[in-house]
């Protein structure tokens, strides 16, 4: 962890010694807990959604979703450092479905790639009629076997 100030990092990532960092899977898990009201508790999840739902920057995932589903509600956090671009989002679509997206790109065009990736993801979710739904019965990253079932 590190404050956004000139002071040094107080707790660095144990793998790469980063002061700010999360894998796409960690980001997806965060949004899963947020959507299910288990990010601390239901009240904290609702407050966090309120904070994440007002993106003032329309790039990366938001830019792509504005083209495919401009009425979607997007809870997101993005970041850019040099040529590294990251975005993570919980997307609630106008048809009532929702999905989680998380991606990192290391290229000067990474922001454009993320806009294109989310367009394709949104199209896949939107065309999922008739496909069996997959349900995870435990929280990703928790201890124990992950149980995945289709249906419902």
Language-model features, listed with the residues they occupy:
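Flexible glycine/proline-enriched surface loops and loop-helix/loop-strand junctions
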Residues: 7-15
């Amino acid at each position: 962890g590190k404050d956004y100030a000139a002071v040094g990092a107080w707790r660095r990532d144990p793998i790469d010694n980063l002061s700010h960092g999360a894998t796409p899977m960690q980001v997806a898990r965060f949004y899963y807990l947020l959507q299910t009201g288990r990010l601390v508790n239901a009240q904290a999840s609702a407050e966090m959604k309120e904070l994440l739902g007002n993106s003032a920057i329309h790039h990366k995932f938001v830019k792509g979703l504005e083209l495919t589903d401009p009425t979607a509600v997007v809870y997101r956090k993005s970041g850019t450092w040099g040529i590294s671009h990251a975005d993570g989002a919980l997307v609630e679509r106008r048809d009532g479905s929702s999905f989680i997206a998380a991606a990192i790109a290391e290229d000067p065009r990474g922001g454009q790639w993320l806009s294109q990736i989310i367009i394709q993801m949104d199209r896949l979710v939107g065309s999922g009629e008739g496909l069996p739904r997959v349900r995870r019965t435990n929280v990703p990253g928790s201890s124990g076997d992950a149980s995945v079932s289709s249906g419902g």
